[in-house]
Amino acid sequence: MATPPYPEDEHSRQAYVDQLGLLEEGADEVFEEILAAATSYFQTPIALISILDHQRQWFRASIGLDIRQTPRRDSFCAYAILGKGVFEVADATLDPRFRDNPYVQGEPRIRFYAGAPLATAEGLNLGSLCVIDREPRGPLAERDVAMLEHFARLVMARIHTLRSTNYIDEPTGLYNRLRLQEDVSLRLQRDGALTVIAADLLPLALLNTIIRTLGYPFSNDLMLEARDRIRAELPDFTLYKISPTRFGLLLPRQQQEETESVCLRLLRAFESPVVCRGIPIKANVGLGVLPLADDTLDGDQDWLRLVVSAADDARDRGVGWARYNPPLDQAQQRAFTLLTSLSQAIGTEEGFHLVYQPKIDLPTGRCTGVEALLRWRHPQLGFVSPAEFVPLAEKTALMRPLSDWVLRHAMAQLAQWNARNIPLRLAINVSASDMEDSSFLEEAVRLAKTYDIDLSALELEFTESVLIRDASAVGSVLLRARELGMGIAVDDFGTGYSNWTYLRDLPITAIKLDQSFTRDLAGSPKAQSVTQAVIGLASQLGYRVVAEGIETHDTFHLLQAWGCHEGQGYLIAQPMLPEQLEDWLRR
């Protein structure tokens, strides 16, 4: 049995099949009606709509045949796509190309075959519409050939209808993301270069709030209003809807110098709130710009992700619009890698360890306690600073498990020190998610019972940013912590609002002066005045004052003279492993 050859345009033909997604669709009633009409007209027991990929033929619809696919080498339709007209086989048992075919020798025992190519406007034959009989027949009459070609054209019309439906965003009636991706591919092949612009109108959090409070229909209507604004400002551009809050448009090669002008017009369109059902919604627009060239674009590169990344960058920096920035994208990719690895590390407890930085009583030099600090050695990236991974964790649900890990291991270490008669006060940093409810405190109480630890040896350190989410809820948790005997310290005091009012309203026991107070303290009279005043006022209010970042003897002596209670910093000691800390204490 001969193997059917591939047409000269096989690569383009296969690419078109892939673009249409014809192999992924389910049953279609229109296809089945066309086949029913074909079998009725030609009086055949079998009719098929077949689409060919590189190795197989797939039946998008069939009558008289139960199978969904066959190898391409066994396909009659693989010959039908080689020409422009109807392909006929009067008796397959007499044709050397087919007489040994398994579908001739066995079921469905094909004898007569006639197939009309399913041709695109570009002349690419995607497959065929064929009729099959189990008995030999003579050649089709001219009118019958014309009718078979007519049925094939009906199939192609339906394919294009399905294609159009698949490429439309239903709420807005605009072309969707799939159509944008196809248009980019086709225009790059034709013109060699273009620019993609993504307009993100609302942060996802704001969209979720709108949906939660006003409903999905309102959010759809809001996007319709936004669509109309863009159309009014840029009537000559094809607009695409590429996500719930994002629109896209293309600048052809000859208009790429107009990029800035187009972006400014888009931003101007949303200077005033979008009024939907009488409710004004202020858009927070970020525009991403990505020039593309056919000779530089990596075939595996997700350019849509890149232009969306640029839009997010523009909004985050408050600049309106921004071109794609590879270093920033690499940073975002690294952040994603870290978050993925962080989740795995929490589950396996691999790569984490704690170090402890001493605090001393400034008047006497005696060590009063330690601060537990988390360290992470990534298996591929090496040491990752907590200044990098903790802010990432705080934006996700990983922060609570991470805090629990620190609490669990720090209290276990404190228990070991207690057993060796090394009494220390342990400070642990807590995040906003730790303060949302009492579960973190409940875990601390459970661990204290397990390790026989007095909770008065535990101090919770939080930054002023913790209060931004829900100051009332945080206050309740802190009050409960204080009732349990824990110390409460405001960390990095001076970097936020430094609001003395919340100090009055919360059960604070200590404030930790940020190292911005102590940096270059000896050389700045103004810094000295501010720092001395803060120490004096905090002391009068009954707070223990701890200075961070002490690195010079001059700073140490100034703070000591002004009545600062405690200090920590590299002059005193760097963060250490438990055994190193014990050696330091003995010295």
Swiss-Prot record:
Keywords: c-di-GMP, Hydrolase. Residues 192-327 form the GGDEF domain. Changing residue 464 to A: Does not perturb the oligomeric state and does not affect kcat. GO terms for biological process: regulation of single-species biofilm formation. Its EC number is 3.1.4.52. It comes from the Bacteria. One of its GO terms (molecular function) is cyclic-guanylate-specific phosphodiesterase activity. Disruption phenotype: Deletion of the gene affects both virulence factors and the quorum-sensing system, and significantly decreases total bacteria in a mouse pneumonia model compared to the wild-type strain. Residues 335-587 form the EAL domain. One of its GO terms (cellular component) is plasma membrane. SUPFAM superfamilies: EAL domain-like (SSF141868), GAF domain-like (SSF55781), Nucleotide cyclase (SSF55073). It catalyses: 3',3'-c-di-GMP + H2O = 5'-phosphoguanylyl(3'->5')guanosine + H(+). Induction: Expression is significantly repressed by azithromycin in a time- and dose-dependent manner. Expression is also affected by clarithromycin or erythromycin, but not by josamycin or oleandmycin. The keyword Hydrolase applies. Pfam families: EAL (PF00563), GAF (PF01590), GGDEF (PF00990). The EAL domain contains a functional active site loop (loop 6), which plays crucial roles in stabilizing the overall protein structure and participating in catalysis, and also controls c-di-GMP and Mg(2+) ion binding. This is Cyclic di-GMP phosphodiesterase PA2567. It comes from Pseudomonas aeruginosa (strain ATCC 15692 / DSM 22644 / CIP 104116 / JCM 14847 / LMG 12228 / 1C / PRS 101 / PAO1).
